[in-house]
């Protein structure tokens, strides 16, 4: 399950964790809603390898989304100790998201 993400979590958590995965989304975004259950499932599957978060770019994740240069949602970014490693933009099937995670974490 994805933990809710707020801007202050970046300094408190993301910079200190070995691997963090953030799904940047918006409440009005259909592809974001479709990706959420996939990410929830993968968060459980990969819980020993990374921490998973859900950031609404219009509610609580505004500054982090802006700093990360989010131009479209959904965007999933993988961080290692607060440094971006890779990102995937747009809704993708579970198999593609798994490949993305395997490659980067």
Summary of predicted features, one role per range:
Residues 9-10, 60-64:
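Short acidic active-site motifs
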Residues 2-19:
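A short beta-strand-turn-helix
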């Amino acid at each position: 399950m994805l933990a809710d993400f707020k801007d202050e979590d970046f300094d408190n958590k993301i910079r200190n964790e070995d691997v963090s995965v953030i799904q940047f989304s918006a409440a009005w975004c259909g592809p974001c809603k479709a990706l959420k259950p996939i990410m929830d499932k993968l968060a459980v599957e990969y819980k020993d390898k990374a921490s998973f978060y859900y950031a609404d770019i219009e509610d609580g994740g505004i500054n982090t989304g802006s700093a990360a240069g989010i131009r479209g949602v959904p965007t999933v970014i993988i961080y290692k100790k607060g440094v971006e490693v890779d990102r995937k933009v747009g809704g993708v099937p579970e198999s593609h998201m798994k490949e993305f995670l395997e490659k980067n974490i």
